[in-house]
């Protein structure tokens, strides 16, 4: 058997209003509604954001691979893009994608105190995943944000 460890998967259909809402759908909704977003810390905190199509691709490749015979126990593969994106860059990318779709969002982020326990930086090492299941992320962070913003603009019912 194979284990897959997912890093910050995002994309269409994520609930921006749930109690465990991920940052990307939450910020997209707030920005579409022309409301401020909050960033804890200085915005340099970073994550390895992975567009959903990359995660689906990894699942399919893992299901079809025969390349795990070299492992004594079932291997665990990281599923991500293999790069760090700061929260400040995330804000700029969403803002840019909204602008490309005719929405001008001009509200600056509200910076709050860094939250105790938050991890400052997270980046996956995907070399094992690339080597054994031949995973190569097809969607960059930027293209994933663009597709996600476009989906929310077309499909998400926004509440006042």
Say what each PLM segment does.
Residues 29-160:
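C-terminal substrate-binding subdomain of Rossmann-fold SDR/epimerase-dehydratase oxidoreductases
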Residues 26:
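Alpha-helical scaffold segments in soluble metabolic enzymes
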Residues 1-12:
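Conserved beta-loop-beta element that borders a ligand/cofactor-binding pocket
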Residues 12-13, 132:
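Residues that scaffold the ATP/ADP-binding catalytic core of kinase and kinase-like folds
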Residues 23:
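Conserved catalytic loops of nucleotide-sugar-dependent glycosyltransferases that act on lipid-linked
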Residues 16-17:
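Active-site loop immediately N-terminal to the catalytic Tyr-X3-Lys motif
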């Amino acid at each position: 058997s194979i284990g897959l460890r997912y890093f910050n998967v995002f994309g269409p259909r994520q609930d921006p209003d749930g109690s465990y809402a991920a940052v990307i759908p939450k910020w997209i909704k707030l920005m579409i509604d022309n409301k401020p977003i909050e960033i804890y810390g200085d915005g340099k905190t970073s994550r390895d954001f992975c567009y959903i199509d990359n995660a689906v691709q990894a699942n399919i490749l893992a299901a079809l691979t025969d390349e795990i015979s070299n492992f004594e126990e079932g291997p665990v593969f990281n599923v991500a893009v293999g790069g760090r994106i700061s929260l400040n860059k995330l804000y700029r990318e969403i803002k840019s994608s909204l602008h490309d779709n005719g929405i001008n969002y001009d509200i600056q982020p509200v910076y709050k105190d860094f939250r105790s326990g938050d991890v400052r930086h997270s980046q996956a090492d995907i070399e094992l995943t690339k080597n054994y299941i031949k995973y190569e992320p097809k969607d960059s962070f930027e293209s994933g944000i663009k597709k996600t913003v476009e989906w929310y603009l077309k499909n998400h019912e926004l509440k006042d």
